[in-house]
């Protein structure tokens, strides 16, 4: 072998080959180094050392040192026995004692599922070593299949195997316990794309390139049968390469990646274009329409077009059609129904495309791989019009979650003002309900990320970096999610103190998973995917108001809230909740109303509906009667009138003016809130088995919501007396992230034998229900334990490497 980065003079050296860090076997051997730093190691030496190296994987890591006088050299080498075959690893998802996560070969991974190991030709060896040193062994490994394919779409398996072995060996040398999380990109080679223009996506503005595609060449349509067939074959063959690799016992995980940045965010928004007008997509839409309408007569009636049928090349709605309709809801009946249909179809079709490849991956791996995708960016795309909202195709989560071929979805959080607050990008409660897990991409910027990343969250100093790392950890714990560190191989996390803090978070995570976790959310927020196709594709002041408050206000409620999709009404255990808040239930139908009444409107529970619940249905027209059936409270709806502020006995709020004002028009209800102009903007009605409340605002701020929820006997757990901080909850753990400090008060749900800071060890009190403490006037996160003295010992003495 040739010694890497070797400057030794030629000669004989005392060689020692053994376990990494001197733990275990050490075998000595005289070794000659020639002028090219080439050495020979006897086979019997390698065999003896290999057999005694620690670990149960086929590929193992040894350390070689050479010494002669003052000349010294050390490197790591990976060894394996070619006569043996690695048993392919297994990856699964589990939920136990109130916690959730991945299992790799039956062993729990923990909330921290890995770090970036290989990206765009660069290997993060030192980073892998540092993360491995604190027990974070997952290595995100980006694989561009097209790099190993020819212009006919054929995979060169030998080249792929050689590249995998070389790259994985380098990472394994840095972390002997590593396992690999393969991010498999489904792009076709640019040469293939040039040969098959009829299979590629088609942009409405005539642009013939894609900013984020390989070579900026247009890529295949989601609906291209040729792409699906050929890439499906490549995926099967690649998985077979994984299974035959000496690293097979280190590959438990596969993430399917396509479209912009591999995140299944459909092409077009960088090009300011609507897509996809390719013939394959036109035909796929036609098949969906035939399934929905059955006959061309029914389609023509729904669309108001005498020329409509299921087979033409102009079914996908034009730019003009997509931009028709109201400033908020499309409405318009037949005039905009083609756009409603297309966006309903496309959410399903995007999810189905992922499932097509997920099924192949599961079958090819003997169902041993954990399989998932970037998907379900509910908040990240919401209202980002045009090109980025419904066009992302990210609102088919309900379909994905019902499939046994998907184990996880996830992605990065929203990037806006991350230093101020953070929420995960998906509806995590529903993901957990279906036995899956949301896996966040933890691309936290630190003080080492540079000025060019300032708008994405670069911190001012180490202290702020650690504060945000602690906050993000607790947010993922609360949402029962996993996450991995993703620094684009720029080594943002290299600060020793930062890594020490992450190591302590690992210990806290290990302790929490060893006990039975009891969460205390009394409120559930329900979000609708069914509503998405009915919302405008234009810029909307109302949608901007929603997004602003979702980003800036919901993380500051100071009480635990669980998030679910409305499609899971029949799965949610509502017995846990006093209040169910329907955030954006603009669309409703008879079945949805039936489920709300059957599952949620029971046992004295309060149902809160925001803004314009149930005002649109399958007719794609305003339907106040349907709204009244959903809520029991009548509304007047004026799409052309503006609204802004709202006031009530518990508080008031100002907001930017937005069109589409709703007002209470029911004389039989109790009015509880008003618009700025004095018209009724909130009402309640008491039924025999539940209470219904309507608030005529798209999403009130944190102060208003806290007051409303307190009115319904929902307890605040954080006072907010020195500012509304981001407070997160996970079993007996509470974290407070404050940027300005001051006096803080927490009210516990039950008395705690001990309250302690899990980083400093400070005991804040014993046998108390109210906790008072101070925080410094700078960004800081305190993670507190509040519970029994016996369980506190578990956290105090935890080992994150267990």
Locate predicted features.
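Short glycine/proline/serine/threonine-rich loop/turn segments at secondary-structure transition edges
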Residues: 47-61
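Aromatic-lined substrate-binding rim segments of carbohydrate-active enzymes
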Residues: 124-211, 230, 239-243, 356-364, ...
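N-terminal carbohydrate-binding accessory modules
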Residues: 73-132, 514
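The substrate-binding groove and active-site-proximal loops of carbohydrate-active enzymes
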Residues: 108-119, 142-161, 213-233, 334-352, ...
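A short, well-structured beta->alpha microelement
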Residues: 118-124, 392-400, 553-573
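Polysaccharide-binding and catalytic clefts of secreted carbohydrate-active enzymes
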Residues: 194-406, 427
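Hydrophobic targeting/anchoring helices
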Residues: 78, 367, 372-549, 633-659, ...
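A conserved amphipathic helix/loop scaffold
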Residues: 465-467, 583-802
């Amino acid at each position: 072998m040739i010694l890497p980065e070797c400057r030794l003079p030629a000669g004989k050296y005392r060689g020692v080959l053994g376990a990494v860090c001197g733990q275990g076997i050490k075998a000595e051997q005289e070794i000659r180094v020639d002028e090219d730093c080439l050495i020979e190691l006897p086979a019997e030496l390698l065999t003896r050392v290999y057999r005694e190296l620690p670990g149960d994987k086929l590929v193992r890591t040894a350390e070689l040192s050479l010494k002669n006088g003052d000349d010294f050299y050390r490197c790591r080498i990976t060894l394996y026995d070619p006569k043996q075959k690695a048993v392919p690893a297994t990856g699964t998802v589990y939920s136990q004692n109130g916690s959730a996560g991945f299992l790799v070969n039956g062993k729990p991974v923990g909330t921290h599922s890995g770090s970036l190991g290989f990206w765009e030709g660069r290997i993060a060896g030192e980073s892998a070593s540092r993360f491995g040193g604190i027990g974070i062994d997952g290595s995100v490994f980006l694989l561009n299949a097209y790099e190993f394919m020819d212009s006919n779409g054929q995979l060169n398996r030998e080249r792929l195997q050689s590249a995998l072995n070389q790259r994985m060996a380098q990472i394994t040398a840095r972390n002997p316990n590593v396992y690999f999380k393969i991010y498999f990109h489904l792009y076709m080679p640019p040469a293939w794309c040039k040969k098959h223009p009829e299979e590629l996506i088609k942009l409405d503005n005539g642009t013939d390139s894609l900013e984020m595609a390989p070579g900026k060449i247009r890529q295949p349509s989601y609906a291209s049968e040729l792409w699906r067939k050929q890439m499906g074959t490549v995926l099967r063959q690649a998985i077979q390469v994984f299974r035959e690799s000496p690293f097979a016992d280190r590959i438990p995980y596969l993430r399917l990646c396509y479209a912009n940045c591999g995140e299944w965010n459909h092409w077009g928004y960088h090009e300011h274009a609507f897509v996809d007008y390719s013939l394959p997509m036109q035909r796929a839409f036609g098949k969906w329409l035939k399934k929905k309408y059955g006959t061309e007569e029914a389609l023509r009636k729904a669309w108001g077009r005498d020329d409509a049928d299921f087979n033409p090349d102009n079914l996908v709605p034009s730019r003009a059609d997509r931009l028709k309709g109201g400033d908020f809801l499309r409405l318009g009946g037949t005039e905009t129904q083609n756009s409603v249909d297309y966006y309903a179809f496309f959410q399903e079709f995007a999810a189905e495309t992922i499932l097509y490849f997920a099924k192949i991956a599961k079958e090819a791996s003997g169902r041993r791989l954990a399989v998932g995708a970037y998907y379900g960016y509910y908040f990240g795309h919401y209202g980002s019009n045009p090109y980025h909202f419904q066009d992302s195709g990210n609102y088919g989560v309900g379909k994905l979650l019902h499939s046994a071929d998907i184990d996880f979805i996830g992605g990065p959080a929203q990037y806006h003002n991350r230093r101020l607050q953070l929420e995960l990008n998906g509806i995590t409660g529903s993901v957990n309900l279906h036995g899956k897990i949301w896996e966040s991409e933890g691309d936290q910027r630190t003080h080492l990320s540079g000025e060019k990343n300032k708008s994405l969250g670069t911190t001012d100093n180490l202290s702020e970096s650690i504060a945000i790392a602690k906050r993000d950890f607790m947010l993922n714990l609360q949402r029962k999610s996993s996450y991995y560190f993703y620094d684009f191989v720029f080594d943002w996390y290299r600060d020793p103190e930062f890594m020490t803090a992450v190591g302590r978070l690992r210990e806290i995570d290990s302790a929490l998973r060893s006990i039975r976790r009891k969460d205390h959310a009394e409120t559930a927020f329900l979000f609708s995917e069914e509503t998405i196709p009915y919302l405008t594709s234009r810029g909307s002041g109302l949608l901007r108001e929603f997004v602003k408050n979702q980003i800036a206000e919901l993380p500051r409620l100071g009480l635990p809230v669980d998030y679910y999709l409305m499609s899971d009404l029949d799965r949610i255990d509502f017995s846990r909740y006093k209040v169910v808040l329907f955030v954006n239930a603009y669309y409703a139908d008879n079945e949805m109303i039936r489920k709300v009444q059957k599952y949620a409107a029971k046992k004295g529970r309060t149902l809160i509906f925001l803004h314009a619940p149930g005002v649109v249905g399958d007719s794609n027209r305003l339907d106040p009667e349907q709204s009244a059936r959903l809520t029991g409270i009548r509304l007047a709806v004026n799409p052309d009138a503006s609204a802004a502020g709202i006031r009530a006995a518990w508080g008031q709020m100002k907001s930017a003016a937005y069109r589409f004002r709703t007002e209470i028009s029911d004389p039989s209800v109790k009015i509880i809130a008003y618009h700025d102009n004095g018209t009724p903007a909130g009402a309640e009605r008491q039924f025999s088995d539940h209470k219904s409340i309507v608030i005529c605002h798209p999403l009130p701020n944190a102060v208003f919501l806290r007051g409303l929820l307190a009115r319904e006997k929902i307890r605040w757990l954080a006072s907010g007396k020195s500012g509304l901080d981001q407070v997160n909850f996970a079993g007996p753990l509470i974290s407070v992230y404050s940027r300005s400090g001051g006096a803080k008060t927490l009210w516990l749900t039950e008395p705690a034998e001990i309250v302690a800071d899990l980083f400093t060890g400070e005991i804040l009190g014993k046998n108390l229900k109210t906790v008072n403490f101070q925080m410094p006037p700078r960004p800081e996160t305190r993670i507190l334990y509040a519970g029994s003295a016996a369980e506190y010992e578990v956290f105090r003495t935890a080992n994150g490497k267990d």
